[in-house]
Design a protein with these regions (language model features):
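Long, C-terminal-biased catalytic regions of enzyme "large/alpha" subunits
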Residues: 1-214
Length: 214
């Protein structure tokens, strides 16, 4: 903005009034992350009021399903459903392994291994504080973690209230584990074939990977 001027209609944004994301977040999230800032937000506030912003909005966080296929990445902040998965692409079913599987396998939290949404809800809430657009968060439930394989309404209601308390702006999907593995179905559930497929993908030359060809 200092070089080329502010974006059109900048005067209609909250930024023009000197309002930053740290002024409008739900303060309950301070229970999770103390409001201690390393950046000089007050100097930034004055600079924005003086020069404007080149873009009217600065940050967003989407599930990034399509871009994750091309970039061979996981879906944004979402926990992967498995180390190996199949995704739809213009080429047809795409076999995809989580990035740096060999060195980071033990650092991944898989979606259906999670016993609840508490940690995920709090992480999204802490991020939302610094975002000027709504994060599309999801809730995921594995019935196997509950009595009679039924997710209690009280659990879902509790998650809903917790997301509101900590300042979520948008809730998107309610995912439920149905005990079906699309990848295993695709390869006829043959013993050891998942591990064989992982080995095959890991040995593939970078330029020859499925994502690179799309």
């Amino acid at each position: 903005a200092k070089e080329k001027g502010p974006c059109g209609y900048f005067d209609r944004t909250k930024y023009a009034d000197g309002i930053l994301p740290i002024d409008t977040y739900k303060t309950d999230v301070d229970e999770l992350v103390a409001p201690e800032y390393n950046y000089d937000w007050e100097t930034l506030r004055l600079s924005i009021q003086q020069h404007g912003l080149r873009h009217s909005t600065l940050s967003a966080q989407m599930p990034s399903e399509s871009s994750s296929v091309v970039s061979n990445a996981t879906n944004g902040i979402e926990p992967p459903r498995g180390y190996l998965s199949t995704k739809k692409s213009k080429k047809g079913p795409l076999k995809q392994i989580v990035p740096q599987y060999g060195s980071l396998k033990n650092n991944y939290t898989l979606l259906w291994d999670m016993k609840g949404n508490d940690g995920y809800i709090k992480i999204v809430a802490a991020m939302q504080k610094f975002f000027d657009q709504a994060i599309s968060g999801n809730w995921s439930y594995n019935p196997e973690n509950y009595e009679n394989n039924e997710v209690p309404v009280s659990v879902m209601a509790g998650d809903f209230l917790k997301t509101y308390k900590y300042g979520w702006k948008t809730s998107y999907y309610q995912n439920t584990y149905d005990n079906k593995d699309d990848l295993l179905d695709a390869i006829d559930e043959k013993p050891n074939q998942v591990q064989d497929l992982l080995s095959e993908i890991l040995e593939t030359e970078e330029d020859d990977c499925d994502s690179c060809k799309i």
